[in-house]
Each structure stands twice: as structure tokens, then as C-alpha cells.
């Protein structure tokens, strides 16, 4: 069995692809994989580190507004599709899977033209431009949010969830909090703004740290590498208690997510898949800097189901974040209700469901 996968640009497209590869290997240990991405995307480094064969094509994304740059993008798309056809002819995959990001456009399109079975995976509640385009040519469209189903032909849709969800369930959290100077078994809030951190989130947290010093519950505050030194210097005079741990980055996030009580974070699709799979309540601060405001749409889906509270970045200045945290952690009924709601939205079997969808289209 040979599988070609393409997706990239951000971790939200790459990590689901890797989760799918790992799940496919469980079912078909003999399977061969080829990842097609760009050298400039996040995928180049991550995929190569995983030891998965990698081929690169050159492609850029379309602008949503009228732009001369889009003419160049069309030319790159056609060139990328031509190169993708050659790569696919050489590899001879049984199936080709796209997990989003503009790089998978020419790859999945080329596969469809070569009559190779194809599937695309849409992680967000708002369909990406590439997946909208590809859905006309693919055999199946796997989705994670019911809200996005109107963007695709109903006969092609299969609801699988995000395969990253399966990778956090059942992870041993022993010693996870202690590794960051905190105590196991105590109510703990994790705050993070994505892999690089988020200035808006950081500013809101810094503003309430003096108040947090007087709380019993713990805080694991992840600033992001690029913000860490500046924030550490600004906090030096606060004499923060031992129940507050400030870190630049968390490398063992699945372990930490299994150990915390509440999460304050952005609303990327992968993060939400992990939180709901584990039943972790959240305060979501969607990034306003993403395509079609998809993070807010993702977050509202959780809020609608009582699994999260949403605060937009514009609202942060006039919102007491500490009071919002208090309102959840000091109300056991509310906390448990949010846990249950998050769990009910979760798809811990998402990886297996996606594998099932992939196998169903193979000739």
C-alpha cells in the first residue's frame, strides 16, 4: 500500500497529516508514504524529522482580493501540478490525501486528473480556499465541524473529526506539572497563544498576574519563545508565587493537557480537537489575523455547546480575564458542565474514522 499526503504552511495542516500517517501504519505496517510540500513551509522541517520521504514543489497561495500576484500564482499552480503528476507517476500511490494549505492544491488536483483516489481533510469550521476548489475533484471530503458541511457536496462528506485528537487521549500525565515546578493534583490553568505565542494574550495575562498571586489555583503560562525574555524581565519585580510557572514553550503538550483543569488559548482547529477529546474546558481568544476569521468560527462552535467561553481580542481590553477564570474554577457545577460538554464534542476516535474513510475510496 502506497500513500501520498500533502498539506502545509502551518502546523494545523501538518500535524493532522502526521497523525493520519501514524494511524495508517498501525493498520498497514507495510505501507509506504510520501509527503509532498514546499521547502518554505513548516512541513519541510517537521516531516523530514519524522523520517518520512519528502518531495517539494513550488507554489504560493491565492489572494482573496483581486491582485496581479494571482496571475503568477496560477502559473505556479500549473507548474506545481505538472511536477506533482511526475512525482505521483514515479511513486504510484494507491491514494492521495490533502490536509489543507495551498500546497495540496496542485498535488490533489494532479492526482484526480491521474484517476488516483483522493480525499481532502478540512480541519476548520470555515472551508479554506484550496479545499473548496479541490472538493470538485476529490472522492471524499472529511470534516471536523458540522458548520462547514454547506461548503461541500453532501454526498462526498464524511464526518471524522481531527486525527490529532486521538494522539492526546490516554497519555500518561504523571510528573507533567512537576516538570514545570508545579504540584500534581491541584487545579491548574494553562495559558498559551500557539507555538509562537500571541502578544494580545500575553498582555492580558500580564495585567492580571498580581491578582493571580492571591489565588490558590496554579498557572502554567506559556509565553512563546519570541516573547519570553522580554516578559521574564518585566515580571522580575512581581515576586510571583511558586504556584505560577512562566515558560517559553511546552514540548510535551499532550502530557500537560491531560494534567490541567482549564485552558486559555487561541482557537486553532488542532488545539480545539485536543481539548474536546480530553473534555478540557477553555477560555478561547481567537486570533483575528487568520483567513476568513476561521478561529472565531471554530471557537463559537464550542461556545454554542457550552464547552468554552469566547473573548475576542478586541474585547480583551474591556474584559476582566481573572474574573472569567474565577467564574469557572470557583463554580464546580459550571466547571463540570463545561467538561462534559467539551467531552461530548470530542472525537477521540478521529484518526481511526479518517483511516476508515481513506480505505473506503481505495480501488
UniProtKB/Swiss-Prot annotation:
Enzymatic reactions: di-trans,octa-cis-undecaprenyl diphospho-N-acetyl-alpha-D-muramoyl-L-alanyl-D-glutamyl-meso-2,6-diaminopimeloyl-D-alanyl-D-alanine + UDP-N-acetyl-alpha-D-glucosamine = di-trans,octa-cis-undecaprenyl diphospho-[N-acetyl-alpha-D-glucosaminyl-(1->4)]-N-acetyl-alpha-D-muramoyl-L-alanyl-D-glutamyl-meso-2,6-diaminopimeloyl-D-alanyl-D-alanine + UDP + H(+)
Keyword entries, A-Z: Cell cycle, Cell division, Cell membrane, Cell shape, Cell wall biogenesis/degradation, Glycosyltransferase, Membrane, Peptidoglycan synthesis, Transferase
Residues that coordinate or bind UDP-N-acetyl-alpha-D-glucosamine: 10-12, 124, 195, 250, 295
Recorded metabolic or biological pathway in which this protein acts: Cell wall biogenesis; peptidoglycan biosynthesis
GO biological process assignments: carbohydrate metabolic process; cell division; cell wall organization; lipid glycosylation; peptidoglycan biosynthetic process; regulation of cell shape
Annotated Pfam families: Glyco_tran_28_C, Glyco_transf_28
Localization per Swiss-Prot or TrEMBL: Cell membrane
InterPro entries named among the record's database cross-references: GlcNAc_MurG, Glyco_trans_28_C, GlycoTrans_28_N
UniProt-listed Enzyme Commission number(s): 2.4.1.227
Enzyme class, spelled out: transferase
Membrane-related topology note: Peripheral membrane protein
A molecular function (GO) term: UDP-N-acetyl-D-glucosamine:N-acetylmuramoyl-L-alanyl-D-glutamyl-meso-2,6-diaminopimelyl-D-alanyl-D-alanine-diphosphoundecaprenol 4-beta-N-acetylglucosaminlytransferase activity
CC annotations in GO: plasma membrane
Function: Cell wall formation. Catalyzes the transfer of a GlcNAc subunit on undecaprenyl-pyrophosphoryl-MurNAc-pentapeptide (lipid intermediate I) to form undecaprenyl-pyrophosphoryl-MurNAc-(pentapeptide)GlcNAc (lipid intermediate II).
Family statement: Belongs to the glycosyltransferase 28 family. MurG subfamily.
Protein name: UDP-N-acetylglucosamine--N-acetylmuramyl-(pentapeptide) pyrophosphoryl-undecaprenol N-acetylglucosamine transferase
Organism: Listeria monocytogenes serotype 4a (strain HCC23)
Taxonomic lineage: Bacteria, Bacillati, Bacillota, Bacilli, Bacillales
Gene from which this protein is expressed: murG
Amino acid at each position: 500500500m502506497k500513500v501520498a499526503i500533502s498539506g502545509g504552511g502551518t502546523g494545523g495542516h501538518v500535524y493532522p497529516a502526521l497523525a493520519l500517517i501514524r494511524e495508517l501504519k498501525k493498520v498497514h505496517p507495510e505501507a509506504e508514504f510520501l509527503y509532498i510540500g514546499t521547502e518554505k513551509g513548516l512541513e519541510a522541517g517537521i516531516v523530514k524529522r519524522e523520517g518520512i520521504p519528502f518531495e517539494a514543489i513550488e507554489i504560493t497561495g491565492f489572494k482573496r482580493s483581486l491582485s496581479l500576484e494571482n496571475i503568477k500564482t496560477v502559473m505556479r499552480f500549473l507548474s506545481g501540478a505538472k511536477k506533482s503528476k511526475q512525482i505521483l507517476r514515479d511513486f504510484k500511490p494507491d491514494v492521495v490525501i490533502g490536509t489543507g494549505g495551498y500546497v495540496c492544491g496542485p498535488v490533489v488536483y494532479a492526482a484526480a486528473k491521474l484517476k488516483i483516489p483522493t480525499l481532502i481533510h478540512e480541519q476548520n469550521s470555515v472551508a479554506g480556499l484550496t479545499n473548496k476548489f479541490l472538493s470538485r475533484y476529490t472522492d471524499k471530503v472529511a470534516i471536523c465541524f458540522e458548520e462547514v458541511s454547506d461548503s461541500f457536496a453532501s454526498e462526498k462528506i464524511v464526518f471524522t473529526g481531527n486525527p490529532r485528537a486521538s494522539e492526546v487521549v490516554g497519555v500518561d500525565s504523571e510528573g507533567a506539572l512537576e516538570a514545570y515546578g508545579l504540584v500534581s493534583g491541584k487545579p491548574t490553568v494553562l495559558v498559551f497563544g500557539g507555538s509562537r505565542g500571541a502578544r494580545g494574550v500575553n498582555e492580558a495575562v500580564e495585567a492580571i498576574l498580581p491578582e493571580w498571586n492571591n489565588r490558590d489555583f496554579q498557572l502554567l503560562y506559556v509565553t512563546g519563545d519570541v516573547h519570553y525574555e522580554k516578559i521574564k524581565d518585566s515580571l522580575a519585580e512581581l515576586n510571583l508565587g511558586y504556584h505560577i510557572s512562566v515558560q517559553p514553550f511546552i514540548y510535551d503538550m499532550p502530557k500537560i493537557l491531560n494534567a490541567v483543569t482549564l485552558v486559555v488559548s487561541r482557537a486553532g482547529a488542532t488545539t480545539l480537537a485536543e481539548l474536546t477529546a480530553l473534555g478540557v474546558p477553555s477560555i478561547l481568544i481567537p486570533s483575528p489575523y487568520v483567513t476568513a476569521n476561521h478561529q472565531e468560527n471554530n471557537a463559537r462552535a464550542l461556545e454554542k455547546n457550552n464547552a468554552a467561553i469566547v473573548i475576542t481580542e478586541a474585547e480583551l481590553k474591556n474584559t476582566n480575564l481573572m474574573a472569567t477564570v474565577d467564574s469557572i474554577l470557583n463554580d464546580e457545577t459550571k466547571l463540570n458542565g463545561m467538561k462534559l460538554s467539551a467531552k461530548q464534542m470530542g472525537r477521540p476516535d478521529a484518526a481511526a474514522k479518517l483511516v476508515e474513510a481513506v480505505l473506503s475510496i481505495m480501488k
